[in-house]
């Protein structure tokens, strides 16, 4: 809806779209940012409202800048002269966003109503920024997603004894618990389907690890499989309605597939698609169309990445990376063009990316701290991962565009297994 409104507005300026074609960004490329001037117009004399609106405007500007394609800056009213100018106009509690090209007249493009819920207001600002980002660049904004992760505050003997799942915004805001199970909950994975933003995770609350279904609206997860043994590392394909996971139901940690839907749950019996002849398997991740899986196997002695075609017919797995011999945690990008993963390089686990088009891989991080669990934002150009040594771990954002990292400041405790998702479907 917003994009149609913007196109109509641009037609008045004699411009169809400044960035109609998606910006193709390679792993090590730089792009010039589009300057954006932002004006804040407050129609209230209430000091507390003015302060609050200024904080929301700061959030909005940071949101626009997050994707590394726009260069927004706050300017005084009437001094805008950038290629595009945005006004954030407040008649409390309503906020209207208007857009103008150069010195042309502003056109309204989005509006929202503030509530008494500060977290909800922040989310509304995130969503407004992402919609405007998409309209200007044809690339999804990434500020409105949620990062879910496992937070432990009682690490002992170099092992996580207990950890609950939490969610947080990219900037550390809106931090809140998702589970209250007094157990160890790990490896959350967004399902990217449904309005309730469901996710899968593994919990030890029954003593051994089992796969559960959770959502942002419910703090109690539901066990989804009735299979003996341990189950780990769930991944879901919304296109194929398939759940991939690892289980030792037959003795060896093997890769399984299970038909699954939110309405019907598990459908039929799970299929073991690889057995012990392919070593110990782990970390499955679907391609966006659900036709392939990337996973880890140690069949050659060390953990390495393999790709398995599962549709239209099952083929034998093929080795993905030959450069690195100790790899784990693969994550397929939403655009289907890249796979992020971890590899031990000079004794340290680093974040790398494999380009499926060129067959080349790149090392993205170099600091002497172990990293794990890369997870993509919806734009396929930004990652979240955890990094730390024994007894400590923090979350970091990584831009493939700028090659820069940024720590998400949350507080005490070990933060592991991040998953970035929950993005609105209407960008």
From Swiss-Prot:
Coiled coil: none annotated. InterPro entries: 6-blade_b-propeller_TolB-like, PD40. The keyword Membrane does not apply. One of its GO terms (cellular component) is periplasmic space. It comes from the Bacteria. Gene3D superfamilies: TolB, C-terminal domain. It is found in: Periplasm. Its main location: periplasm. Keywords: Periplasm, Signal. Residues 1-20 form the signal peptide. NCBIfam families: PRK01029.1 (NF002183). Belongs to the TolB family. This is Protein TolB homolog. It comes from Chlamydia abortus (strain DSM 27085 / S26/3). The gene is tolB.
